[in-house]
Amino acid sequence: IATVDCSDYPKPVCSLEDMPLCGSDSKTYSNKCNFCNAVVDSNGTLTLSHFGKC
């Protein structure tokens, strides 16, 4: 199972780094920061499906 450590999030600003992650909501997040901010917003219900685009 792929996991991402989001303990340092949320962050107010994310870099434009392009390292896509696919969330359990079938959305592609451009990088870990954007994904982790979404995880925090979802109260932990969003999980990582896999690395790369959905």
UniProtKB/Swiss-Prot annotation:
Disulfide bonds: C6-C36, C14-C33, C22-C54
Glycosylated residues, chain numbering: N43
Subcellular location: Secreted
GO molecular function, one term: serine-type endopeptidase inhibitor activity
Site feature Reactive bond 3, where: L16, E17
Major location (coarse): secreted
Highest taxon of source: Eukaryota
Keyword presence, Secreted: yes
First and last residue of the signal peptide: none
One GO CC term, this protein: extracellular region
PANTHER family membership: OVOMUCOID-LIKE-RELATED, SERINE PEPTIDASE INHIBITOR, KAZAL TYPE 2, TANDEM DUPLICATE 1-RELATED
Name by which UniProt lists this protein: Ovomucoid
